[in-house]
Amino acid sequence: MGKLRILGSGTSTGVPEIGCTCPVCTSTDPRDNRLRASSLLHTDDAVILIDCGPDFREQMLRASSFEKIDGVLVTHEHYDHVGGLDDLRPFGRFADIPIYSDAYTAAHLRARMPYCFVDKVYPGVPRIYLQEVEAGQVFHINRTEVLPLRVMHGRLPILGYRIGGRLGYITDMHLMPEESYEQLKGLDVLVTVSYTHLT
């Protein structure tokens, strides 16, 4: 599987949430401070970023990590998962970075960041490009196998990922089709976030 570093595991607003007076948000315990969801995976042959939210710059400064990113797996187009894509600029020094997402998310990214996805980009923009993927269709980042899985975030269909055959990564899950459960069998590690509580 390699090494997975959780860069952020907070809610869409981060923790603490501005204006919240609950015990967690007013806590002085540093463990109660969480940046928005993102992870960095090192496999045998690839460095893969999973989601790239608005805290990405701070996450990478904290991680002291500046290396080639071979691909970014995007789960969905919500700002807390893509708001940091512009901060990939310095990483373009190594190579152009593929952004893997479903067609729906790719369309939203093209509309939000048109300056990145045109034939002739001007200097200084992130060196990123979109690669559309489909749930259930395997692709590779270098030699690392990636299987996108269908997940439901409320009524919004999003992607989870099975990476390298041994790691599952699913965020903002409300429901998941039976076929996605089947595709997760045999994992060593499953990282999941569910925003609803059943009790």
Segments the model singles out, each with a brief description of its role:
Residues 196-199:
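Conserved small/polar residues in nucleotide/adenosyl-binding loops
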Residues 173:
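Anionic-ligand binding region
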Residues 1-169, 178-182:
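Binuclear metal-dependent hydrolase catalytic cores
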Residues 178-194:
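A short alpha/beta connector and helix-capping loop motif
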